[in-house]
């Protein structure tokens, strides 16, 4: 396992953290009956992103290139939705959005390296 593979595993666990965060957000803000400042479809977006995050986690470990593409696509989607549809800094300093943005920047900056240098896979048969 080289440095790119180790970093890819770390990145994969970042998506698990994201999935757990999305579940926490949905529970804390009303689950299916959320009427907060975000759009009414927000809970369904979070549930969907939660599942996608887990798929990205698995693909980063099992099929590195598929995982890298999915991680970039997921971060582009999550950042666009979060920066345009949800209250950003209206209710104070939004550390969650800044953390998500930082994670997205890390994904974007490391994608070329991970694409070319990742070799290790979870299963040698994959």
Regions found by a protein language model. Give the residues of each.
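Topology signature of small-to-medium multi-pass alpha-helical membrane proteins
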Residues: 1-126
